[in-house]
C-alpha cells in the first residue's frame, strides 16, 4: 500500500559486503548474498537478474560505487524479505505475483520492480490516480493507461472502502433531480 517498507537495520546488517574497486567485482560479491538452497535453478535466475539490474543501474548514471552498493544492499534486503513468499514450493514454470499499490516513489523501489520483472514473478503496479507520477520505466513491463482516475490511498481489502455508482444508480439520481427539484412533486408523497 503506497510504498515498500524500507529495510530494517537488522536486514541491512545481514548483507555481507566488502570494499570494492570496480562495479563487476562488487556485483559478483554482492550476489553471493542471494541464497535459495531449495532450488539451485531459481537461485541462478535470481543472481542473473540481480546482476542485470545492477549493471543497468551502473551504466545509466555513471553512479558512484558506494551509492550503487547502497542500492544493491536495499535490493538484496527486499529479495531476502520476499523470496520465501514469492517462491514458496517453486517448481519450473511456476510464477509468483507481486502487487504494488501506487506509483514507485523512489529509485530503490524502481530497481526492485525491475528485478522482479526479470524473475518468474508477475508484477502488477496499480496507480489509480493518474496525477501520481511513477518513476518506473522498463521495456519488460507492459503498461496500460486508462482515461479515468481516482484517488485511492491503499489497496481495497473490503469493498466498503470503494463505492462506484452504476449506470442505473446515476440514471435514478438524474431522474430524481429532474422530477423532484423545483416542482410541486415531493418524493415522500409519491405513491
Question: Model segments located where?
Answer:
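Active-site and donor-binding regions of nucleotide-sugar-utilizing enzymes
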Residues: 49, 54-145
Amino acid at each position: 500500500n503506497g510504498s515498500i517498507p524500507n529495510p530494517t537495520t537488522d536486514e541491512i546488517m545481514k548483507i555481507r559486503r566488502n570494499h570494492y574497486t570496480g562495479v563487476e567485482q562488487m556485483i559478483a560479491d554482492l550476489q553471493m548474498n542471494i541464497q535459495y538452497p531449495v532450488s539451485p535453478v531459481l537461485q541462478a535466475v535470481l543472481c542473473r537478474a540481480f546482476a542485470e539490474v545492477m549493471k543497468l543501474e551502473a551504466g545509466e548514471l555513471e553512479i558512484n560505487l558506494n551509492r550503487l552498493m547502497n542500492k544493491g544492499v536495499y535490493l538484496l534486503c527486499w529479495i531476502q524479505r520476499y523470496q520465501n513468499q514469492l517462491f514458496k514450493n517453486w517448481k519450473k514454470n511456476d510464477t509468483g505475483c507481486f502487487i504494488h499499490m501506487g506509483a514507485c516513489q523512489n529509485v530503490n523501489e524502481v530497481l526492485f520492480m525491475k528485478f522482479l520483472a526479470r524473475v518468474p514473478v508477475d508484477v502488477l503496479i496499480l496507480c489509480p490516480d493518474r496525477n501520481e507520477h511513477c518513476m518506473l520505466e522498463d521495456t519488460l513491463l507492459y503498461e496500460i493507461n486508462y482515461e479515468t482516475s481516482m484517488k485511492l490511498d491503499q489497496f481495497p481489502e473490503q469493498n466498503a472502502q470503494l463505492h462506484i455508482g452504476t449506470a442505473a444508480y446515476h440514471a435514478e439520481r438524474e431522474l430524481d433531480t429532474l422530477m423532484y427539484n423545483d416542482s410541486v412533486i415531493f418524493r415522500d408523497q409519491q405513491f
